[in-house]
Amino acid sequence: MNALTDADYVDVKLTAAEVLLASHVGCMRNVQSLKKATDRVEPEPRKYWQSNIIGAIGECVIAKYFNIYWSGAVGDWRAKDVGDFEVKTNEQIYKKNVLMVKKGNSPDRKYFLVAGNAFNYRIFGWVDGYDIMSEARWGDPPHNSPLD
């Protein structure tokens, strides 16, 4: 798998058990955030549950594809998502998917873009953290720039 391109993607099908496991991880992460009253950079606060669950499912997809153990870490927001990778997940496959990063994200990791729903997901590829964090890649601010 190469860096992000329009023609380079891989489809991954999760089992019901894998989706259930990842969903539980997302729920645990959300409860922990609520308990700690963590300040979050979330465009729509009512989607906290959704973003945590979808994010955990995306991590599960990458772990399955690369056959890497996924701990589903809860409580350490600085931990890497899967192995040495970070995963960004959209809940649907669009004609043009966008990999969004935050300014605080680590530039020394590879960022994978995953999209899908139910049991069917697509890995669109990856981009180097240093590359995506450079202002030249931000696109049309504020829509494609790293979030504050």
Residue positions per predicted region:
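Nucleic-acid endonuclease domains
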Residues: 1-83, 88-148
